[in-house]
UniProtKB/Swiss-Prot annotation:
Membrane topology: Multi-pass membrane protein
Record flagged with keyword Transport: yes
Bias kind Basic and acidic residues: ranges: 273-284
UniProt feature, compositional bias: Acidic residues: 256-268, 295-306
UniProt KW keywords: Chloroplast, Membrane, Plastid, Plastid inner membrane, Protein transport, Transmembrane, Transmembrane helix, Transport
Region described as Disordered: 247-314
Subcellular location: Plastid, Chloroplast inner membrane
Transport found in the keyword field: yes
InterPro entries: TIC214
Role this protein plays: Involved in protein precursor import into chloroplasts. May be part of an intermediate translocation complex acting as a protein-conducting channel at the inner envelope.
Name of the protein described by the UniProt record: Protein TIC 214
Assembly and interaction partners: Part of the Tic complex.
Lineage: Eukaryota, Viridiplantae, Streptophyta, Embryophyta, Tracheophyta
Stated family: Belongs to the TIC214 family.
Length: 1859
C-alpha cells in the first residue's frame, strides 16, 4: 500500500510538474493564439481560395508564419515589442497599406490575380502576397484581442525563468494550431471544388454555376472585407483631436493646493499591455523643466501637449511660446529602442519667425501619442465640499526602494520619481552617498523604529498615569490641532484639506503679499543670485544640449545644495503661490564666462519678474459642470466656463420677472437672471458625454453597439443578459405561452357573457392606453431627432418663424380677401369685419422647446440653439359665412369649446398639431358647409319632384286595379264551367276508378310493410352502448316512421271498407263475404303481434339505461359512505382527546394571563371556515397528522424549568442535531428546554488576547455588517444567518448564559465582489481604514468573514425576560446587537439601484398568511415578558383576520405623531388590522405585543426620522385611521392627501426640543436595543453638529454671506443649513395640475389683457384656480402638504473620533448593575457635553455607589487614531524582542480561565477580582497576518507610493513567531 501511494504521489507530482512547465504553458498560449483570427487570415484564405500558383500559396504561408514569429520574438525582445506595440505603428503601417491595397485590387489595370506562367520569385505579385501576410500578421486581432493574450504573456514572463523556451514553445503551439486550421480549410475548399454546381433549390433558381461565379467575384469580396478592416482600424486609431488646454488656477487654489498633485483616475486606451518597464521608459518625458505659459492664444493654433507622469497622473507641459525673443522651438525625437540613455532632445536653432511653426511637436507625437491627455478623463467630486478629492490610478513600475530597512524591488514605484532620481544621480556624481550594507541598513531601521516606539509608549504611559491621578478626561485625551480659516468666526478648514490632519495634503497656506506690492529693489537685488542658481540647475539637468556642455566644469558642486536652498527661498519671497520653472532658452543670453551684459541684464530681469509672477498650469481641482455654471451666472459671481461635459441639458426659462416685455431677438441681461424661473430639460438620448472633462482624450469605445436612434443607455453587448428586454429577445414569453396553451385552458373553463364583455372593455382601454403611449414615444422620438441633428434647431426655428409670419400676414389675409370678393361676385354681402375680428383674435405665442408659453413678442433664450415652439391661440378658421348671434352657435358655447381645442401648435410645414411634434390635425374645410348647404337645396328639389311622381304612381295603380278586377270576373266564369264538366265525368266513370284504386292500395301496403320490418331489423343490430346517443336518435326516427306507416294502413283499410265491401254486396249477394272475414281476422292478429314486437325493440334501450342509473344512484353512495362515516367518528374522537389534553395542559400552566384562555391552533388545517375565527368555543375539524413541530416546542416552552428538567436527558444529544431547523433548536435552547450542545459545537477559545475577548463581549461595539462587507470587498448579500448557542453548566434556571453570535456571510458561492463605491472623499478614507484595523481580530476564522459576538445579559436568577432578541427572524436585516444609528444610514445602502426604497427593510420576504390565524409571537420565536416582577409571561394570540384587502388603499403607514405619555391610547399602529385590545394597550407595552424589530426601528425613527425607509415601514390598509393628531404638531390633512413621514422631519424643526424631552420620558419603553439606538443618536447628533458646521460654512461661502430679508429666503437658508441637500417634490395628485398652472401663469404675466385667456383656460379645464397658493411660507406649504422636503441622505462621516466616542460610551457592565426591571433602568440619554456625563454614567453602571473608580475600557483611545495605529504596528515590527505581543498571564493561564468571567458573568465568586480587573488596562493586540500589514501600511503611515487595493505592495517583514 505504501508503495502504491508513493507511486501514485510521484505520478501526480510528475503530472503537475508537466502541466506547470514552461513548455506546456507556451504550447497552450500558442494554441490560444491560433484562434486570434485577424485580417492576416483573409490574405491567407485568399491565396488558398483563388486559383493561383503554388508559389503564391507558399509565399502566403511563409509570410504568415514569419509575421507570427516576429510577434512571438517581440515578446522577448523589448525594442521590437515597443516598435510593434505602439498604436501609431498600427495606424501608420496598416491604414495606408490597406487603402492602397483596396484601390489597387479594384482597378483592373493595376494588378492581375489570375494565373501566371512566370515561375520566378521576382514576380511582383508573389512578393506582394508575402508582404500582405507578413504585415497583417503584426496587427491586432479581431476575435480574441491581443491585449488579453499580451496580459497572459506579461504575467507568465514575469514568473518564468527560461523566457526563450517559453517563446519557442508558444510559437510551436501556434504552428501546430495553424497547420490544423489550414488543413481544415483545405478540406473545406476541396469539398467545394468537387461540387462545382450546387443542385437547384426552390429558393435559388438557375444557380448551376454559383460556385464558379463566387470564385470569380472572390477578389471583390476580399476587397470589401479589407475595406471593413480599414474602417475598423480607423475607429481604433487615437485620432489627432484638437484638445483644450488646462485652465488657469486662481491664487487661492494655488495656495491651498501646493501639494495637490493627487488622484485623478485615468482610463487608458492602450491596446497592447506590453512589459510595463520598457513601455514606461520608452515614453520618457522631456527632462528639461520647460516654462508653461497660460496666455490666451489664437484659436487657429493647436494646443498640443506632451505628458509628464507624476504620481500616476499625466501632467501637461505647454511649450513656452515666447513673445519677446527669437523662438527656438524644441523637437522631441524618440528612439523607440527602450533605452533610457538614447532618448535625446535636439534643439534646432532656426532663426525664422515663430509663426512659421504652428506646432512644436514631432509629427508622430502630434498624431499618434495615444497617452496624450491634456487632462484626466474622469472627475470624481465630493458632494460635501466644493473642491474635488481625487483618486489616483495605480501604476506599475519596477524600481528598488528601501523598505523595512532593506533594499527591495517595488513594482508600484512612481515612474516620474524614478526618472528624476536617475537623472540627478547620473549628473551629480558627488552627491551619491556611500552605500550601506544591508545589515547596517536593517540595524538602523530597527533602531529608529525602536526609538519611535518608545517615544509613543512613553507618551501613552504618561497619559494613562494622568488618568490614574484623576485628571479630567478631556485634558488627557490627545487633542487634534486644526487649521482655522478665520479666527474670529472660528471656522476650521475641511478635514480633507487640513494639512495638520492628512500628510499627503500638507502644504503651506500662508497669506503672503502679492507680487504687485513687492519692492522692486528686492527683486533687482536677488536677480543676480537667481540667475546663477538657475544657470546651475539647468546646467545639471540639461547637459545633453551642446550649447551648455562647456558649462559643467564651472559649477562648484559642494555649494549646490546651499544654492538650491537659497534659490527656493528667494523665489518664495517673490511669489508665495508656487515655484515656477524657467525657460532654458533665456539662458542663451549668458556669455561664455558667465557675465551678463547691461542691456541684456535689464531685459532678463524684466523677463524673470514677468515669468516668476506667472502661474504654472496645474490640475484644476475646481471644475464645474454646466448646471453649476448656470447657477453661478445667477449669483453675484464671475461665471466660469464649465469644464465637465455633463448630460445634454437645456435651461428652459419659463418666467422672467423683468417688469417689461423684452425685444424680439434679444436675450435677458445678467441683472434680470436672478429673478428667472427656469427648468432644466435633459435630452432623452444616450449620454455619451458621461461627465468627461473637456479636452480629455476619449477612450475609443469599440465594444459599444447602438442599434436604435433612441437608446437609453449605451452599453456593451456583453451585458445583454442584464437587460430586461433586448432588441433580439423582445417577444413576450408569457403571451406566447398563453397562445400555446389556450386550448388546454379553455377546456375546463366556462366563460360567462359578463366576463367576456368586461374583457373586451379592458382590452379596448388597454389598446387606447397603448396607442397614447405609442403616440407619446413617437413625439419624443421626433423631438430628439430634431435635437440631435446638427443645425436642425436653427433650420426648424427659422422655418417656424417664417411659417408663422406667412400664416398670419400672408395666407390668412389673402384667404379673407378671396372669400369676400367671391361673396360679392355671388351677390352676397361681404363679411370683412367678422373675418378680421377672428383674424385678430389669433395669437402666436412663442414657447420653449417643451411647449412652455412665454409671450407673443419674447423669444426664448437661445431659441436658435435650444429650439422653439409656436403655439397658436384661437386659431383662425375661414368660414364661408358667419351666423347671427341668435343661431345655434350661441346656444351652447361651452359645448363647442369643450369639443374643439382653442389652441394648436404650428408645424414646420405650416400645419396645425394638437401637441408639439404631434401628427397634423384635420382642418375644418371651407367648402364643407357650402356642400352641406347645396345638399340641402338638392334634397328640397328632390322632395318636390318625388311628390309629383307619387301622384302619377297612384293614378297608374288605380287603372291597373280596375283592369285586374274585370279579368278576375272572366276567369271565375270559365272555371265554373270546367267544374261542371268534371262532375259529369265522375258520375259516368266511377266504377272503373274504384277497382283500379283498390289494387294499387294493396300493392302499396305490401311494399310499405316489408320496408318497415327491414328497417327495424337494421336498427336492432346497430344498437350499442358506446354510441347510445346515436342509437336513441335513430330509434326516435324509427318510432315516428312506424306511427306514420300505421296511420297510412288504417286509412287504407277504412277506404277499403267504404268502397270495396259495399260494391261486393251490391254485385253478388252470396256467402263470399263471410269467408273473406274469416281470412281477415288471423291476418289482423299477426299484425298486432308485429306491432308489439316493434314497440318492445324500441323501448329496450331506454329500459337498460334506466336500470343502470338506478343502481348507480342508490347503491353506490351507501357503499362509499360506510368507511367515511367510520373515519369521521374515529377522527372526531381523537380530536376530542387531543383538545382535552391541550386544555388540561394549559390549565396547569403557571402564570398564564386570565384573559387569554382560548386555544391557539397550530394544527395546519385543510378547510377552515372564516366565520369560526372569532368563535372561541367552536370545534374546528383538523387533520392531526400534520401537527407541526413548532406547536410541540411552543407548548414545551410554556412549561416551567423544573418540569422540563427531566426532558433534558432525552432532548440533549451529542451526535448530529435531531432538529431539521436550527431555529427550533436555538429557540428551545434559549428557553432552557434542553442544553443545545452537540459535538460540532464551537468551543470558546480562551487562548485569545484580552482585546479580542473584550470586543467579542461588547456587541454594541460591532460595526455594521455592510461596513465589514465593504472592508473585505464582498457584497452584502440578502440574508444574515445568525447562530446563537447557550451554555448552562451550573444553574438549572439559566441564571446567566452566553450567546455566541455567528453572523455568517454567504460567501462560499458568492464571489460577486462589490468594488468600493466611488466615494472618493478623503474624509471617508481615514475612517474606513480605521475600521480596517479592527477587522483583523477575526483572522482565525477560515470559512469567511464573520463576527463572533457574545452579548452580555445578566439576570438575578429569574426567568429571562427576552426584551433583547435572542433570535432575530431571518426575514429581517437589522441585527439587534448593532446600534441602529450604524445600520440605517443611507451611506451603507449598496443595492440602491435595484430598489431605492428598500434600505434593508424589504417586506417582500415577509410572507404573512392573511387568511389564517397566526400567532405572530411564536412565528417569530420571540417570547414576551409583561411583568418581570410577577415572573409571568403573556402571549397575545388574538388577532383579527383580514378577509379582504381593499386594493384601492395605499399600503403605507404614516407616522404623524410622537408618543405622548399623557395620551397613550391614540391610534398609533394599526398593523394589518389587529384587534382593538392591542391597539388600546398602553404604549409601555408596545414592544411586548409588537415585533421587536419594529420597535427598534420606531425608536430610531422617533429620534432620527430621516433614517427610516421612504415608503414601506408597515402595511396599513385602513385609511381612515391614518389621520392622526398630535399635541405638538397641529397638522391637518385633506381628503386623499397624506405626507410621507420623511417630511415629518422638516416639521420637527419648530419643536425639536420638546420632542426630545418626550423621547427622554419614554424610559419604560426602552429595551437594550432601544438604548443603543438612543446612544447612537447621541453620538450621531454630535457628529451631525460637526457636519452642520461644515455645511454652514460652505453655504456662507457659496452665497457670499448675503443677508436674507424675506421670510421665504430665511426659511430656505435654514433648511439648507440643516440638510445641505434636499429635494422638493409635489405630491402626485397635484403634479400635472401644477405644471399646467405654471404654464398658464407664465403666459398671463406677459399678456396685456389676460382676462380673456384666463377665463378660457379655466373653462377648458387647463387652469384650476382652487389650488392657487398665494404668499405661503415654506412651513405653511409643508403643513398643507403641497411641499414635501425629503433630505438626500448625507454621507455619514465616521472617523477615528467617532469610533473613540462610540468606544468610550460602552461600559463594562457588572452583573449586579445590569437590571432588566424597567424601574431600575438607567436613562441613556447623553447631552451635548457628553464626555463628562458619559463617564459619570459609567461610574454608576460599572462601580457601585461607594466606588469612584472607572475606566475607559480601551485605554488606547486616549491617543489619536493615527498614533494608536502607529504604536500598534511598531510593536508588531519589534524584531529584536522574541515576545512580539505583550500578553497578560492572567488571561493566558489555562488554570485561570475563570477570570474571563468578567465578560461572561458565569460565576458569582468573581466579585473579589473586580477591582483588580477594572484597573487592568486592556492593551493586547493579535498577531497580524503579513498580508494585512501589507494592505494597511500605506494608510497607517500615510505613504503615497502605490495603488489602493488593486495590487498591494508585498512587504517581506521578519517572520513573526506565532504561539
Amino acid at each position: 500500500m505504501i508503495l502504491k501511494s508513493f507511486l501514485l504521489g510521484n505520478l501526480l507530482s510528475l503530472c503537475m510538474k508537466i502541466i506547470n512547465s514552461v513548455v506546456v504553458v507556451g504550447l497552450y498560449y500558442g494554441f490560444l493564439t491560433t484562434f486570434s483570427i485577424g485580417p492576416s487570415y483573409l490574405f491567407l484564405l485568399r491565396a488558398r481560395v483563388m486559383e493561383e500558383g503554388t508559389e503564391k500559396k507558399v509565399s502566403a504561408t511563409t509570410g504568415f508564419i514569419t509575421g507570427q514569429l516576429m510577434m512571438f520574438i517581440s515578446i522577448y525582445y523589448a525594442p521590437l515589442h515597443l516598435a510593434l506595440g505602439r498604436p501609431h505603428t498600427i495606424t501608420v503601417l496598416a491604414l495606408p497599406y490597406l487603402l492602397f491595397h483596396f484601390f489597387w485590387n479594384n482597378h483592373k489595370h493595376f494588378f492581375d490575380y489570375g494565373s501566371t506562367t512566370r515561375n520566378s520569385m521576382r514576380n511582383l505579385s508573389i512578393q506582394c502576397v508575402f508582404l500582405n501576410n507578413l504585415i497583417f500578421q503584426l496587427f491586432n486581432h479581431f476575435i480574441l484581442p491581443s491585449s488579453t493574450l499580451a496580459r497572459l504573456v506579461n504575467i507568465y514572463m514575469f514568473r518564468c525563468n527560461n523566457k526563450m523556451l517559453f517563446v519557442t514553445s508558444s510559437f510551436v503551439g501556434w504552428l501546430i494550431g495553424h497547420i490544423l486550421f489550414m488543413k481544415w480549410v483545405g478540406l473545406v475548399l476541396f469539398w467545394i471544388r468537387q461540387n462545382h454546381s450546387i443542385k437547384s433549390n426552390v429558393l435559388i433558381r438557375s444557380n448551376k454555376y454559383l460556385v464558379s461565379e463566387l470564385r470569380n467575384s472572390m477578389a471583390r469580396i476580399f476587397s470589401i472585407l479589407l475595406f471593413i478592416t480599414c474602417v475598423y482600424y480607423l475607429g481604433r486609431m487615437p485620432a489627432p483631436i484638437v484638445t483644450k488646454k488646462l485652465k488657469e488656477t486662481s491664487k487661492t487654489e494655488e495656495r491651498g493646493e501646493s501639494e495637490e498633485e493627487r488622484d485623478v483616475e485615468i482610463e487608458t486606451t492602450s491596446e497592447t499591455k506590453g512589459t510595463k518597464q520598457e513601455q514606461e521608459r520608452s515614453t520618457e518625458e522631456d527632462p528639461s523643466p520647460s516654462l508653461c505659459s497660460e496666455e490666451k492664444e489664437d484659436p487657429d493654433k493647436i494646443d498640443e501637449t506632451e505628458e509628464i507622469r507624476v504620481n500616476g497622473k499625466e501632467k501637461t507641459k505647454d511649450e513656452f511660446k515666447e513673445t519677446c525673443y527669437k523662438s527656438r522651438p524644441v523637437y522631441e525625437n524618440y528612439y523607440l529602442n527602450g533605452n533610457q540613455e538614447n532618448s535625446k532632445l535636439e534643439i534646432l536653432k532656426d532663426k525664422e519667425d515663430k509663426d512659421l511653426f504652428w506646432f512644436e511637436k514631432p509629427l508622430v507625437t502630434l498624431l499618434f501619442d495615444y497617452k496624450r491627455w491634456n487632462r484626466p478623463l474622469r472627475y470624481i467630486k465630493n458632494d460635501r465640499f466644493e473642491n474635488a478629492v481625487r483618486n489616483e490610478m495605480s501604476q506599475y513600475l519596477f524600481y528598488t526602494c528601501k523598505n523595512d530597512g532593506k533594499q527591495r524591488i517595488s513594482f508600484t514605484y512612481p515612474p516620474s520619481l524614478s526618472t528624476f532620481l536617475e537623472m540627478i544621480q547620473r549628473k551629480i556624481y558627488l552627491c551619491t552617498k556611500e552605500k550601506l550594507s544591508s545589515e547596517e541598513m536593517y540595524n538602523h531601521w530597527i533602531y529608529t523604529n525602536e526609538q519611535k516606539k518608545n517615544n509613543l509608549r512613553n507618551e501613552f504611559i504618561n497619559r494613562i498615569e494622568a488618568l490614574d491621578k484623576e485628571f479630567v478626561s478631556l485634558n488627557v485625551l490627545e487633542k487634534i490641532t486644526r487649521l482655522c480659516n478665520d479666527e474670529t468666526e472660528q471656522e476650521c478648514s475641511p478635514k480633507v484639506y487640513d494639512p495638520l490632519l492628512n500628510g499627503p495634503y500638507r502644504g503651506t497656506i500662508t497669506n503672503l503679499y502679492s507680487s504687485s506690492i513687492m519692492n522692486e529693489t528686492l527683486i533687482e537685488d536677488s536677480i543676480e543670485t537667481l540667475c546663477l542658481c538657475i544657470n546651475k540647475i539647468h546646467g545639471i539637468l540639461l547637459t545633453d544640449y551642446r550649447e551648455f556642455e562647456h558649462k559643467i566644469n564651472k559649477f562648484d558642486r559642494k555649494s549646490l545644495s546651499r544654492d538650491i536652498g537659497h534659490l527656493s527661498t528667494s523665489i518664495i519671497e517673490f511669489d508665495g503661490e508656487s515655484i515656477p520653472s524657467f525657460n532654458f532658452k533665456a539662458l542663451s543670453l549668458l556669455t561664455e564666462d558667465g557675465r551678463i551684459d547691461s542691456e541684456d541684464q535689464a531685459k532678463f530681469s524684466k523677463f524673470l519678474v514677468k515669468e516668476i509672477s506667472k502661474r504654472v498650469p496645474r490640475w484644476s481641482y475646481k471644475l464645474i459642470d454646466t448646471l453649476e455654471q448656470e447657477e453661478r451666472e445667477n449669483e453675484e459671481e464671475v461665471a466660469e466656463d464649465h469644464e465637465i461635459r455633463s448630460r445634454k441639458a437645456k435651461r428652459v426659462v419659463i418666467f422672467n420677472d423683468n417688469g417689461q416685455n423684452t425685444d424680439t431677438h434679444t436675450n435677458t441681461s445678467n441683472d434680470d437672471q436672478g429673478n428667472e424661473v427656469a427648468l432644466i430639460r435633459y435630452s432623452q438620448q444616450s449620454d455619451f458625454r458621461r461627465d468627461i472633462i473637456k479636452g480629455s482624450m476619449r477612450a475609443q469605445r469599440r465594444k459599444i453597439v447602438t442599434w436604435k436612434l433612441f437608446q437609453a443607455n449605451v452599453h456593451s453587448p456583453l451585458f445583454l443578459d442584464r437587460i430586461d428586454k433586448t432588441f433580439f429577445f423582445s417577444f413576450d414569453i408569457s403571451g406566447m405561452m398563453k397562445i400555446i396553451f389556450r386550448n388546454w385552458m379553455v377546456k375546463n373553463t366556462e366563460l360567462k357573457i359578463s366576463d367576456y364583455e368586461e374583457e373586451e372593455k379592458n382590452k379596448k382601454e388597454t389598446e387606447k392606453k397603448n396607442e397614447k403611449k405609442r403616440e407619446e414615444k413617437t413625439r419624443i422620438l421626433i423631438a430628439e431627432t430634431w435635437d440631435s441633428i446638427l443645425c436642425a434647431q436653427v433650420i426648424r426655428g427659422s422655418m417656424l418663424v417664417i411659417q408663422s409670419i406667412i400664416r398670419k400676414y400672408i395666407v390668412l389675409p389673402s384667404l379673407i380677401i378671396a372669400k369676400n370678393i367671391s361673396r360679392m361676385l355671388l351677390f352676397q354681402f361681404p363679411e370683412w369685419s367678422e373675418d378680421l375680428k377672428d383674424w385678430s383674435r389669433e395669437i402666436h405665442v412663442k414657447c420653449t422647446y417643451n411647449g412652455v408659453q412665454l409671450s407673443e413678442t419674447e423669444f426664448p433664450k437661445n431659441w436658435l440653439i435650444d429650439g422653439i415652439q409656436i403655439k397658436i391661440l384661437f386659431p383662425f378658421c375661414l368660414k364661408p359665412w358667419h351666423r347671427s348671434k341668435l343661431g345655434s352657435h350661441h346656444r351652447d358655447p361651452m359645448k363647442n369649446k369643450r369639443k374643439k381645442n382653442d389652441f394648436c401648435f404650428l408645424t414646420v410645414w405650416g400645419m396645425e398639431a394638437e401637441l408639439p411634434f404631434g401628427s397634423p390635425r384635420k382642418r375644418l374645410s371651407f367648402f364643407e358647409p357650402i356642400c352641406k348647404e347645396l345638399e340641402k337645396k338638392i334634397r328640397k328639389v328632390k322632395k318636390n319632384y318625388f311628390i309629383v311622381l307619387k301622384i302619377l304612381k297612384e293614378r297608374t295603380k288605380l287603372f291597373i286595379k280596375v283592369s285586374k278586377e274585370k279579368k278576375g270576373w272572366v276567369i271565375k266564369r270559365v272555371l265554373f264551367i270546367k267544374r261542371i264538366i268534371k262532375e259529369l265525368n265522375k258520375i259516368l266513370f266511377g266504377l272503373r276508378e274504384v277497382y283500379d284504386s283498390s289494387e294499387n292500395k294493396n300493392r302499396k301496403d305490401y311494399i310499405i310493410s316489408n320496408q318497415m320490418i327491414h328497417e327495424s331489423s337494421i336498427r336492432i343490430r346497430s344498437m350499442d352502448w358506446t354510441n347510445s346517443l346515436l342509437t336513441e336518435k335513430k330509434m326516435k326516427d324509427l318510432t315516428d316512421r312506424t306511427n306514420t306507416i300505421r296511420k297510412k294502413i288504417e286509412r287504407i283499410k277504412r277506404d277499403k271498407k267504404k268502397t270495396f265491401l259495399t260494391s261486393e254486396i251490391k254485385i253478388s249477394p252470396n256467402e263470399r263475404s263471410c269467408d273473406n272475414k274469416k281470412l281477415e281476422s288471423p291476418k289482423n292478429i299477426w299484425q298486432i303481434l308485429k306491432r308489439r314486437n316493434t314497440r318492445l325493440i324500441r323501448k329496450w334501450n331506454y329500459f337498460i339505461k334506466f336500470l343502470i342509473e338506478r343502481i348507480y344512484i342508490d347503491a353506490l353512495p351507501y357503499i362509499i359512505n360506510i368507511p367515511r362515516i367510520h373515519g369521521r367518528l374515529f377522527l372526531e374522537s381523537k380530536k376530542k382527546i387531543m383538545d382535552k389534553s391541550i386544555y388540561n395542559h394549559e390549565k396547569n400552566q403557571e402564570g398564564i394571563d386570565e384573559t387569554n384562555k382560548n386555544t391557539t391552533h397550530f394544527i395546519s388545517t385543510i378547510k377552515r371556515p372564516l366565520s369560526n375565527n372569532n368563535n372561541k368555543n367552536s370545534k374546528i375539524f383538523c387533520d392531526l397528522s400534520s401537527l407541526s413541530q413548532a406547536y410541540v416546542f411552543y407548548k414545551l416552552s410554556q412549561t416551567q424549568v423544573i418540569n422540563k428538567y427531566n426532558l433534558r436527558s432525552v432532548l440533549q444529544y451529542h451526535g448530529a442535531s435531531l432538529f431539521p431547523k436550527e431555529r427550533i433548536r436555538y429557540f428551545c435552547g434559549t428557553r432552557g428546554i434542553f442544553n443545545s450542545q452537540s459535538k460540532h459545537k464551537r468551543l470558546r477559545n480562551f487562548g485569545m488576547n484580552e482585546w479580542k475577548n473584550w470586543l467579542r463581549d461588547h456587541y454594541q461595539y460591532d460595526l455594521s455588517q455592510i461596513k465589514w462587507s465593504r472592508l473585505v470587498l464582498q457584497k452584502w448579500r440578502n440574508r444574515v444567518n445568525q447562530r446563537r448557542t447557550v451554555q448552562n453548566k451550573d444553574s438549572k434556571k439559566l441564571g446567566s448564559y452566553e450567546k455566541d453570535q455567528l453572523i455568517h456571510y454567504e460567501t462560499e458561492h458568492d464571489y460577486e465582489v462589490y468594488s468600493l463605491p466611488s466615494q472618493k472623499e478623503n474624509l471617508k478614507k481615514n475612517y474606513r481604514y480605521d475600521l480596517l484595523s479592527y477587522n483583523y481580530i477575526h483572522y482565525e476564522n477560515k470559512k469567511g468573514s464573520y463576527i463572533h459576538v457574545s452579548p452580555l445579559q445578566v439576570t438575578k436568577g429569574r426567568e429571562i425576560p427576552y426584551n433583547y432578541n435572542i433570535h432575530k427572524p431571518e426575514f429581517f436585516y437589522v441585527l439587534g446587537g448593532i446600534p441602529i444609528s450604524d445600520y440605517l444610514g443611507e451611506d451603507y445602502i449598496i443595492d440602491t439601484e435595484e430598489n431605492p426604497d428598500r434600505k434593508y427593510f424589504d417586506w417582500i420576504i415577509l410572507n404573512f398568511c392573511l387568511r389564517k390565524k397566526l400567532d405572530i409571537e411564536a412565528w417569530t420565536d420571540i417570547d414576551t415578558g409583561d411583568s418581570i416582577n410577577k415572573n409571568t409571561k403573556t402571549g397575545t394570540n388574538n388577532y383579527q383576520i383580514i378577509d379582504k384587502i381593499d386594493k384601492k388603499y395605499l399600503f403605507y403607514l404614516t407616522i404623524h405623531q410622537e408618543i405622548n405619555p399623557s395620551n397613550q391610547k391614540k391610534n398609533f399602529f394599526d398593523w394589518m388590522g389587529m384587534n382593538e385590545e392591542i391597539l388600546n394597550r398602553t404604549i409601555s407595552n408596545l414592544e411586548l405585543w409588537f415585533f421587536q424589530e419594529f420597535v427598534l426601528l420606531y425608536n430610531a425613527y422617533k429620534i432620527k426620522p430621516w433614517v427610516i425607509p421612504i415608503k414601506l415601514l408597515l402595511l396599513n390598509f385602513n385609511r381612515n385611521k391614518n389621520v392622526s393628531e398630535n399635541k405638538n404638531i397641529n397638522k391637518k390633512q385633506k381628503n386623499d392627501l397624506w405626507i410621507p413621514f420623511t417630511e415629518k422631519k422638516s416639521i420637527e424643526l419648530e419643536n425639536r426640543n420638546q420632542e426630545e424631552k418626550e423621547t427622554r420620558g419614554q424610559g419604560d419603553l426602552g429595551s437594550d436595543a432601544q438604548n443603543h439606538g438612543n446612544l447612537g443618536y447621541v453620538l450621531s447628533n454630535q457628529q451631525k453638529d460637526v457636519e452642520e458646521d461644515y455645511a454652514g460654512s460652505n453655504i456662507k461661502k457659496r452665497r457670499k454671506k448675503k443677508q436674507c430679508t424675506s421670510n421665504t429666503e430665511a426659511e430656505l437658508n435654514f433648511l439648507l443649513k440643516r440638510y445641505l441637500l434636499f429635494q422638493l417634490r409635489w405630491d402626485d395628485p397635484f403634479n400635472q395640475r401644477m405644471i399646467n398652472n405654471i404654464k398658464v401663469y407664465c403666459l398671463l404675466l406677459r399678456l396685456i389683457n389676460p382676462k380673456e385667456i384666463s377665463i378660457s383656460s379655466i373653462q377648458s379645464g387647463e387652469m384650476s384656480p382652487d389650488i392657487i397658493q398665494k404668499d405661503l411660507t415654506i412651513t405653511e406649504l409643508i403643513k398643507k402638504g403641497l411641499l414635501i422636503i425629503e433630505p438626500v441622505r448625507l454621507s455619514i462621516k465616521r472617523d477615528g473620533q467617532f469610533i473613540m466616542y462610540q468606544t468610550i460610551s460602552i461600559s463594562l457592565v457588572h452583573k449586579n448593575k445590569q437590571q432588566t426591571n424597567g424601574r431600575c433602568r438607567e436613562k441613556r440619554y447623553v447631552d451635548k457635553n457628553y464626555f463628562d456625563e458619559s463617564i459619570a454614567r459609567h461610574e454608576k453602571m460599572v462601580g457601585t455607589g461607594d466606588e469612584n473608580h472607572y475606566e475607559l475600557l480601551v485605554p488606547e483611545n486616549i491617543s489619536s487614531p493615527r498614533r494608536r495605529r502607529e504604536l500598534r504596528i511598531r510593536i508588531c515590527f519589534n524584531s529584536g524582542n522574541k515576545n512580539f505581543v505583550d500578553r497578560n498571564p492572567v488571561f493566558f493561564n489555562e488554570n485561570k480561565v475563570k477570570h474571563c468571567g468578567r465578560f461572561l458573568d458565569e460565576n458569582k465568586h468573581l466579585d473579589t477580582d473586580k477591582k483588580k480587573l477594572i484597573k487592568l488596562k486592556c492593551f493586547l493586540w493579535p498577531n497580524y497576518q503579513l498580508e494585512d500589514l501589507a494592505c494597511m501600511n500605506r494608510y497607517w503611515f500615510n505613504t503615497n507610493n502605490g495603488s489602493r487595493f488593486s495590487m498591494s505592495r508585498i512587504h517581506m517583514y521578519p517572520r513573526l513567531k506565532i504561539r
